[in-house]
Amino acid sequence: MTFSIENNKQVVLGEELGKLSDNERLKTQSNFLRGTIEQDLQDRITGGFTADNFQLIRFHGMYQQDDRDIRNERAKQKLEPLHNVMLRARMPGGIITPKQWLAIDKFATEHSLYGSIRLTTRQTFQFHGVLKPNIKLMHQTLNSIGIDSIATAGDVNRNVLCTTNPVESELHQEAYEWAKKISEHLLPKTKAYAEIWLDGEKVETTEDDEPILGKTYLPRKFKTTVVIPPQNDVDVHANDLNFVAIAEKGKLIGFNVLVGGGLAMTHGDTSTYPRRADDFGYIPLEKTLDVAAAVVTTQRDWGNRSNRKNAKTKYTLDRVGTDVFKAEVEKRAGIKFEVSRPYEFTERGDRIGWVEGIDGKHHLTLFIENGRLLDYPGKPLKTGVAEIAKIHKGDFRMTANQNLIVAGVSKSNKAKIEKLAREHGLMDEGVSEQRKNAMACVAFPTCPLAMAEAERFLPQFVTDVEGILDKHGLDKEDNIILRVTGCPNGCGRAMLAEIGLVGKAPGRYNLHLGGNRGGTRVPKMYKENITDKQILEEIDQLVGRWANERLPNECFGDFTVRVGIIEEVIISKRDFYA
């Protein structure tokens, strides 16, 4: 036995990791994720959930939040915070039909505090500001259109991402089908979701079984992608498990498997760090689900259940050794990884505007700044997408860059859809390449973990950066992958950007430099805890040097490493804080 839990302590490969964290107690006592959520739903005295259920609802795809803009004012009035939930839907590969879209649009308008639909870096949508009396209605509305939110949060395999490649339609369809299969294979098997939210028939707990995830589920969240090179729109190095599509003559034949990526860290704790995924090798298609389960169960058994800050797969690999972890996966899956097939990641951005697929269908990628679909003055974006949904015969594809593709448009419908998009501000040639390559997480006012602004901060910040690029005579193609995340948990994927800002306190950020265009290098901290004004001053100086000293076609991140402005991070555990 390579692992054991005795006397509330965890031992892995002979090493005692310590006393189990309280989250392990919570999961053990939850009766396969049921807890006392149903009782909490009946309690109308508070808008929130009790301590254990506050954590357990995450496994059902929700986070308890409140409006931090009004928290202090409510406290003065002797009121509890305005508790509500954010829901993240499970949409493997980000594909949603027009009928489904119209239903989620209606729910967001009628039953959420903010009336918005938020496209996220997890290639799905979120509802924000849903009050307790509307939570069950939300789940039942989604269920009626074939959507759920099972395992989009919590210590489970989360929404499976897939490259949105509308041009190579057949290859994308194959990759998407695998994303769906992986999602279903790794999904929790408990009936708790149906019982609580869909008024499903109660079953005896002895019928529950979790053959892959186990009774206490995973040590920490787990993220999986299917990616089609050379596009790295899903950011493989932000994820625990990645299947890199290998094709011959446009047909999918197998995957290279990358394991152990992840971006979250904790300020001031050098045992935490962002990390690139390791390439385990190539597998044929028929071994995909076996390998997925083997990686997940190895992490289930070997991951740190004592210290949640060191519980993710990336730390397990660094603790036990990549070769040891890989050998265990091979043993459990009954395979030997072959040598990786050649591939390269060159870009991550979405191709905004129209493209024609090899199947003759047209696809329109709409740039949605920060993924927030709402009706703004003069730009009724949310209404615009709903109007398109009313006439669109194909599907919509949410991207991991928080944009939206109107996919599978016939030639006869193309002009009508473009007209609607332009009328509602969804197509705008005035949007710069720099803005298209910038991204932020939600942060304030709804995220309880945010230390600084991100989504509300980014638009003006990008305008300021655009001014700096213009000042130094750079062309519109000379843009920088720029990302802002409101806290070190990394939802905005700033730790794979050429310029990454990580929130430290209100109005203050850590400035990281040195990522690259393809998302294959972790940036390093350049300045700590500085204001946005100071950040812009630093960027001004750095961009000035880049404009004058760069090599032909040298991107900003590569330049900062080459000239020694920042040291390259090769092995994160060794280099990130060095």
Curated annotation (Swiss-Prot):
To which pathway does this protein belong?
Sulfur metabolism; hydrogen sulfide biosynthesis; hydrogen sulfide from sulfite (NADPH route): step 1/1
**Top EC category:** oxidoreductase
Q: Name one GO molecular function term.
A: sulfite reductase (ferredoxin) activity
Cellular component terms (Gene Ontology):
sulfite reductase complex (NADPH)
Alphabetized Gene3D superfamilies for the sequence: Sulfite Reductase Hemoprotein, domain 1
Task: Give EC number(s), comma-separated.
Answer: 1.8.1.2
Q: Does the keyword Mitochondrion apply?
A: no
User: How does the cofactor attach, per the note?
Assistant: Binds 1 siroheme per subunit.
Family designation: Belongs to the nitrite and sulfite reductase 4Fe-4S domain family.
| Function in brief | Component of the sulfite reductase complex that catalyzes the 6-electron reduction of sulfite to sulfide. This is one of several activities required for the biosynthesis of L-cysteine from sulfate.
Name by which UniProt lists this protein: Sulfite reductase [NADPH] hemoprotein beta-component
What does the organism's lineage look like at the top? Bacteria, Pseudomonadati, Pseudomonadota, Gammaproteobacteria, Vibrionales
